[in-house]
Amino acid sequence: IVPFLLGMVPKLICLITKKC
């Protein structure tokens, strides 16, 4: 579960801040 969360966080930040 932890690796999954670590993979999702950057994607969420990317979507929210529009910085990909």
Swiss-Prot record:
**Major localization class:** secreted
InterPro entries recorded: Antimicrobial_frog_1
What is this protein's tissue specificity according to the annotation?
Expressed by the skin glands.
User: Where are its TM segments located?
Assistant: none
Q: Which UniProt keywords apply?
A: Amphibian defense peptide, Antimicrobial, Disulfide bond, Oxidation, Secreted
Compartment(s) of residence: Secreted
Keyword Secreted in the entry? The reply is yes
Q: Which GO terms describe its cellular component?
A: extracellular region
Any Pfam family from its record, for instance, is Antimicrobial_1
What is this protein for, i.e. what is its function? Antimicrobial peptide.
Q: Member of which family?
A: Belongs to the frog skin active peptide (FSAP) family. Brevinin subfamily.
> Which lineage do the record's taxonomy fields give for this organism?
Eukaryota, Metazoa, Chordata, Craniata, Vertebrata
Residues with Methionine sulfoxide modification: 8
> Is Disulfide bond given among the entry's keywords?
yes
Which cysteines bridge via disulfide bonds?
14-20
GO annotation, biological process: defense response to other organism
Protein name as annotated: Brevinin-1ITb
